[in-house]
């Protein structure tokens, strides 16, 4: 029976215990043969830790682990190097002392092996001393591997003072890579994000960022070709277990888990965590999203007064995508680098990228996740509320639908009055985007109004929301613009609905329904 490496981050365990391994060693060999200092950002659960572990096994000279892989037939000299492996992923960073304590513990462990000097009083000096003594003791360069270098910075988003403290600590710490260059054989730092202007790497001008490098676009993640090369029989097993055809399974996998692009002209990549979970459990699910979404993402969107309608079609420059500045007014870089948005198109003339959701799992999961942050609904109630909305709209229960919608706007904070139009737009966008996963829904905004078209098996709803004005004016707008004409021969019952919001009550004030 096939063993799928769900959650397996140790290359040694994976190989010795007979788990599936999709061979990435050709790219790894290219990486280690053509450069020395690298940085790679990829979303969480995308295989970064396994990549680090694989490189560690290579530099440990564990030739037996690579039997049958590309690198086995290419590498002739299997040499063991001293390795300094940092794993910052599993720690909690909530104070200035926490980062210091964690780095101190790591260094203390290595100092027991490589010694220390009285003059090495700072974290940076201690790290430099360890690098030099490890290299001198082994008679060869040191390999430095850092997994999730940015975990402290990410946990401090929203706390500028703590971020500044972490930035200064990490900048000095990683500066050892440059000052002890002659003692280093290879270095790779990985993380979810690239903090640019906060200057962690400002002194490391020798660090090559391969996050946007087409040559290494497939280093993490799984391509469609790799699925058919390594998992072809598994596709048939999945089809049998889900009562689907082979073609339906391939289409569903692509819709749910494919679609990640990290350069403008790369092949689409499947999320490895969701893909492997699907094969391991022999059923589809939102596996990546269920492992947790950081709360700071929703907070960033709200703090920056971001219009959520732009999520599906955000146009950005390369400079914006390529780093995160905590003082900037855009949440887009962190959404992109965290895997919630991806490259959909590229305009070479203007050197701009169009971003959107990579796939169905991310789009449905992220929109559902945002609902409690914007509407008056508890996270545990979200699924029930959406199910009720769909039931009401499919059964023509218009009054119940709008009463429920009113409850979504209940307790809108008074401070939202300045951005009331954006607040209304965002709540309605989330709601009708969620409805659109189960019904046909179209959403348009312009000049203080929102147009909504919802189609179900029996009904067509044409809705006009006025953010300033009356429900009567909203209904008149539908009639004047002849919105219903394209649907008059449809056969379904058609309802025109005019709705207005009150800035005084910060809620829906009135709705008028007219059936054709």
Which ranges hold each PLM region?
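Phosphate-binding site recognition
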Residues: 1-420, 435
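Active-site metal-binding core of divalent-cation-utilizing nuclease and nuclease-like domains
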Residues: 134-138, 431-457
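Structural motif
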Residues: 143, 459-461, 495
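Mg2+/Mn2+-dependent nuclease catalytic core
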Residues: 163-169, 467-484
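Conserved catalytic cores of phosphodiester-cleaving nucleases, focusing on short active-site segments
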Residues: 428, 452-467, 481
